[in-house]
């Protein structure tokens, strides 16, 4: 265990250090490896080329999520490449003895949804996955990295990664959030203020009373988008909220093992006098419902603000802003409220969990999607879908004019049939608004909370969700 004055990151890093490589990098043991159908086929092929096997199949969990259709999931898929990729994962998992949650298993879903909900993700773990948003698992006090295909191969073969140790930045936020402000607004606000490159070389520790008051699914939303602020990973110290979420889940410790685990997890928390490379403070009361207007997650504004004028921006931000004005067809100085939307999407590893769907359904109840708007809800997993239907949430969405889909990554990245067409503009609860991200080379994306997506869907345009919270006269 690291000495006192250590952060959780330091403690977990030290506990998982195998050695120091000639390059100066740390060889880090990976406790849990999550794989899916897109970044694993080439990794398995590289194993076979070298005559290698999977070192710890029991520490590997697989599912299909990126390319699966969310309307009909009847096999074989119409998309032959998608069918081939899923068959490859089926075959690879069978050959190497890897636990695999396929469509129809009852537990399939987005990889960053299924691992926490089943209790695979636990405090103090090191976790890797061939997906950018692996930082999601940091919500549990784990250190989780998104990795590339060659690194997927390395973890399969050696259960280790070669990594440079990160600096640690404490993002401290205190205070209560106003009604209509959600975890998604919090992380969009942080990225807006710090920028998309500020976290390069850092792990972000999210701390303070605001994060302590969040439930686990809200914390996952925050950590999920740490990468969008440039951070390699983000995490929150485990606490009673963490333990209450984990207790009794399929792969969480049971009985006496549970008590020992909680005692161990408590020791992993950052020490009260931990030394950080720097600390940045935020006031939760300053955050309003937030929406992106541009082509990076850092180009965000409060919903009641105007699209920023170039002269109001730092000089280094102006070229990208000019590019965003042209691509998004938004004029500087104009309110973002009232911007017409074509598609409204609720889902993704950022906001496709049960609490997200409950909040969205509460706002959709008694309202209806505006004419000309396509709106759909994609549960993050088969378990989320099953529970949402048990609560009747799907009926609320259907009555309000939303489509109710099968689990998958869906329009977050459009490696599946869920895509924008032409210059369509989407209100999306996902995590990236890059050019072409949602399937059309000219499609446009506004990132926002699921509640804000509902407000846009029923209004037919960007709208302030706080108006939906006001009592009807």
Curated annotation (Swiss-Prot):
UniProtKB keywords: 4Fe-4S, Amino-acid biosynthesis, Branched-chain amino acid biosynthesis, Iron, Iron-sulfur, Leucine biosynthesis, Lyase, Metal-binding
Record-level Gene Ontology MF annotations: 3-isopropylmalate dehydratase activity; 4 iron, 4 sulfur cluster binding; metal ion binding
Xref: Pfam families: Aconitase (PF00330)
Binding site for [4Fe-4S] cluster: 349, 409, 412
Annotated GO biological process: L-leucine biosynthetic process
InterPro entries found in the cross-reference section: 3-IsopropMal_deHydase_lsu, Acnase/IPM_dHydase_lsu_aba_1/3, Acoase/IPM_deHydtase_lsu_aba, Aconitase_4Fe-4S_BS, Aconitase_4Fe-4S_dom, IPM_dehydratase_rel_enz, IPMI_cat
Cofactor binding description: Binds 1 [4Fe-4S] cluster per subunit.
PANTHER family the record matches: 3-ISOPROPYLMALATE DEHYDRATASE (PTHR43822:SF9), HOMOACONITASE, MITOCHONDRIAL-RELATED (PTHR43822)
Family: Belongs to the aconitase/IPM isomerase family. LeuC type 1 subfamily.
Subunit structure: Heterodimer of LeuC and LeuD.
NCBIfam families (alphabetical): leuC (TIGR00170), PRK05478.1 (NF004016), PRK12466.1 (NF009116)
Protein name as annotated: 3-isopropylmalate dehydratase large subunit
Lineage: Bacteria, Bacillati, Cyanobacteriota, Cyanophyceae, Gloeobacterales
